[in-house]
Design a protein with these regions (language model features):
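Transmembrane beta-strands of outer-membrane beta-barrel pores
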Residues: 54-60, 103-107, 166-174, 204-212, ...
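Cleavable N-terminal export/targeting peptides
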Residues: 1-45
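Short loop/turn motifs that connect adjacent beta-strands in outer-membrane beta-barrel proteins
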Residues: 38-48, 89, 94-100, 145-163, ...
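Surface-exposed strand-loop-strand hairpins of Gram-negative outer-membrane beta-barrel proteins
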Residues: 58-83, 127
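Outer-membrane beta-barrel "beta-signal"
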Residues: 359-373
Length: 373
């Protein structure tokens, strides 16, 4: 809970528990009736924060989607993406809830169906398909031990609280792959305080994912395949349960002079363990660059610099209403795909040699503007 939230909650609790101490007993009360003021109720949500964002990723990627560079000198796996986002955050008596939904609109290097890759239809026929549209939603909820057990024993030094954490994710995209991600997480969160009203959270979790891959569908690029062994009956992939660690932090740059005290830094990182064969078909996996075994995925935004534009131009009363920001993103083994293997996806033959498609590890900058309402 933020400093502001704790201050508001403490003030309201002090009002709710206020008892006039100037009367020794009921016998001292005056003869006439005094109508007591109603005790204000605490709101169910102590904080509600809703925001919309538009941002742009110049060099995003989508694994397995790439085009040849001029002269067949290598592969271009970069995809520019426009991102439209809505986020909701709330604090209630026993914890927090976060929900976010994003729409990513790609350029032509990440095409929609029926193209199977940039500028290519099934059978190798040339075509120009529009950029794909992806929807991704994420939910995280925490339940604080201090609040559940009505204690402060889980706060010590910089440790602010320990919480149960549960979460879910969903994703779908209108490309040929036709992904349909459903993921679930459960574990603990350790919340630490940082200077200048900041925080640092670490959450070890169990992670389970289900997905879909149209390329694995029996009868689709799988002549002579064995259903359930070398092709998927319905294209569904049931990954093994694995481990995950999610980290996020935030801190105002409060050490700056008041005249320029409009900046904050934040970041996040998610580490997700291997979850079995990428296609759910281990009999198809080869060795070396032909392997389809998943690897540990690192999905991170190590640093984001935020400028509080509304505070700078309209004053402290309007802090955080309009912010602009820029961030650096690093995503290794995207979706768990081994960037050193996965022949035909993360690596492919060009000019007689196997070269990286540069689509399974993303290094990009993202810039955006966020409005709170």
């Amino acid at each position: 809970m933020s400093y502001r939230t704790k201050a508001v909650a403490a003030a309201m609790l002090s009002l709710a528990s206020f008892v006039p101490m100037s009367f020794a007993s009921a016998a001292d009360l005056p003869a006439y009736k005094v109508k007591a003021k109603p005790v204000p109720d605490l709101p169910f949500f102590l904080v509600i924060d809703d925001r919309v964002t538009f941002s742009y990723i110049g060099t995003g990627t989508d694994p397995g989607v790439f085009s040849a560079k001029p002269g067949n000198t290598g592969w271009n796996g970069n995809t520019a993406k426009s991102v439209y986002s809505f986020t909701h955050f709330d604090v209630w008596a026993y914890g927090t809830n976060f929900f976010g939904i994003n729409m990513f609109k790609s350029d032509h290097n990440d095409p929609t169906a029926p193209c199977i890759n940039a500028g290519v239809l099934p059978g190798g026929i040339a075509a120009s398909c529009s950029g794909a549209t992806e929807f991704f939603g994420l939910l995280r909820s925490t339940y604080g031990w201090n609040e559940i057990f009505n204690t402060k024993m889980f706060s010590y030094g910089p440790l602010h609280n320990i919480s149960f954490e549960i979460g879910a994710e969903g994703e779908a995209e209108n490309n040929y792959l036709a992904p349909n991600k459903r993921a679930f997480e459960a574990g603990l969160q350790f919340a630490f305080d940082l200077p200048y009203k900041g925080y640092f959270n670490v959450a070890p979790l169990a992670y389970k994912e289900l997905n879909h891959n149209a390329f694995n569908q029996c009868g689709n690029f799988t002549a002579g395949a064995i259903p359930g062994a070398t092709c998927s009956v319905d294209g569904e992939t049931n990954f093994k349960t694995t481990w995950a660690v999610e980290i996020n932090y935030y801190m105002d740059l409060g050490f700056l002079p008041e005249s320029v005290n409009y900046f904050a830094i934040s970041g996040r990182a998610g580490f997700y363990g291997p979850k079995g064969d990428a296609n759910g078909l281990p009999l198809n996996s080869g060795v070396g660059v032909a392997s389809t075994a998943t690897k540990t995925e690192i999905n991170s935004e190590p640093i984001r610099l935020t400028f509080d534009a509304s505070k700078a131009f309209w004053g402290p009363k309007y802090a955080q209403f309009v912010t602009t920001w820029v961030s650096y993103r690093y995503w290794e083994n995207k979706f768990g795909l081994d960037h050193n293997a996965e022949l035909g996806v993360c690596n492919a033959v060009i000019g007689g040699t196997v070269q990286s498609t540069h689509s399974c590890t993303e290094q990009s900058y993202q810039a955006g503007i966020t409005v709170k309402f």
